[in-house]
Amino acid sequence: MKPSIYSLTRDELIAWAVERGQKQFRATQIWDWLYKKRVQSFEEMTNISKDFVSILNDSFCVNPLKQRVVQESADGTVKYLFELPDGMLIETVLMRQHYGHSVCVTTQVGCNIGCTFCASGLIKKQRDLNSGEITAQIMLVQKYFDDRKQGERVSHVVVMGIGEPFDNYKNVMCFLRVINDDNGLAIGARHITVSTSGLAHKIRDFANEGVQVNLAVSLHAPNNDLRSRIMRVNRSFPLEKLFSAIEYYIEKTNRRVTFEYIMLNEVNDSIKQAQELADLTKTIRKLSYVNLIPYNPVSEHDQYSRSPKERVLAFYDVLKKNGVNCVVRQEHGTDIDAACGQLRSKTMKKDREKVTATK
């Protein structure tokens, strides 16, 4: 199975081409074809010799993904189900915002973090995506825009899809370098957010990278007891370790951290828990932000339900009175399979039913 050429940074592409007797400018031409003209095959690169096109074809594919399902919401949100070369399925979501077009990418096939409310973890991690497979998600959404010929572009990226990005650290960092490259897609670092469930040692590594990419932490509980019950990762990285790493990140980067907090009815949404959350974030208040997220119910996790609006607002009010920067997240795609992992799970179930029916 040939790797995608999207898995190379520009410097890596230059080194690869030079090793094969090409001048540096040849790699620059190829890079332009990929990310500015956004061709789908090497044969479309008209200023590259046929001999070198043949070498490219022998070494790489361009986009390794196949589009299986597309769902479009009334609010313009588009959810894609892509098939990988080995037949596995991943999800990608395009969200239209007032400030631009944001794409949520997947980094792993399945997830081992084990959050008890999440559709992503219904299927255990089967493998990491390589950097080319992550980049390819952006490229196919950008192709959707290019085909519409309205001058639209992917302006923001959130690494919040299926999987734990910091459990696939090397490939995620390569992906970030590719999409941020000024000579390519040129998606600004401050328009990119990486979300982690709380791998404290990787937060420290990320702080040391020196990148301007935003960091979000999936918190979802204000104390160790509850967080360990609903997020298995907390047993390895309890709040003390997590917040030590977050404080290191803030000190090292002077950048704000966003805390994601899914509102689960009568689980983590009480007034007492709001005060606990305010107290937990007190020492980093100036450089932290809390995002309260309405829960998208998952049939396999029917022990959870969405917090009523009045409970969300009461929770929000406590945070605001304590000086916490916070917002209730605007929902997208509520009329389609909105929860992360839902579309993939449903499609896999249908595929299994088809196989069973033919036996």
UniProtKB/Swiss-Prot annotation:
It catalyses: adenosine(2503) in 23S rRNA + 2 reduced [2Fe-2S]-[ferredoxin] + 2 S-adenosyl-L-methionine = 2-methyladenosine(2503) in 23S rRNA + 5'-deoxyadenosine + L-methionine + 2 oxidized [2Fe-2S]-[ferredoxin] + S-adenosyl-L-homocysteine; adenosine(37) in tRNA + 2 reduced [2Fe-2S]-[ferredoxin] + 2 S-adenosyl-L-methionine = 2-methyladenosine(37) in tRNA + 5'-deoxyadenosine + L-methionine + 2 oxidized [2Fe-2S]-[ferredoxin] + S-adenosyl-L-homocysteine. [4Fe-4S] cluster binds at residues 111, 115, 118. Disulfide bonds join 104-340. Its cofactor is [4Fe-4S] cluster. Transmembrane segments: none annotated. Residues 97-329 form the Radical SAM core domain. The active site is at 91 (proton acceptor), 340 (s-methylcysteine intermediate). Binds 1 [4Fe-4S] cluster. The cluster is coordinated with 3 cysteines and an exchangeable S-adenosyl-L-methionine. Keywords: 4Fe-4S, Cytoplasm, Disulfide bond, Iron, Iron-sulfur, Metal-binding, Methyltransferase, rRNA processing, S-adenosyl-L-methionine, Transferase, tRNA processing. InterPro entries: Aldolase_TIM, Methyltransferase_A, RlmN_N, RNA_MTrfase_RlmN, rRNA_lsu_MTrfase_RlmN/Cfr, rSAM. Its main location: cytoplasm. GO terms for biological process: rRNA base methylation; tRNA methylation. GO terms for molecular function: 4 iron, 4 sulfur cluster binding; metal ion binding; rRNA (adenine(2503)-C2-)-methyltransferase activity; rRNA binding; tRNA (adenine(37)-C2)-methyltransferase activity; tRNA binding. Its EC number is 2.1.1.192. It comes from the Bacteria. One of its GO terms (cellular component) is cytoplasm. S-adenosyl-L-methionine binds at residues 163-164, 195, 218-220, 296. It is found in: Cytoplasm. Reaction proceeds by a ping-pong mechanism involving intermediate methylation of a conserved cysteine residue. Specifically methylates position 2 of adenine 2503 in 23S rRNA and position 2 of adenine 37 in tRNAs. PANTHER family: 23S RRNA METHYLTRANSFERASE, RADICAL SAM CORE DOMAIN-CONTAINING PROTEIN. Belongs to the radical SAM superfamily. RlmN family. NCBIfam families: rRNA_mod_RlmN (TIGR00048). This is Probable dual-specificity RNA methyltransferase RlmN. It comes from Streptococcus pyogenes serotype M5 (strain Manfredo).
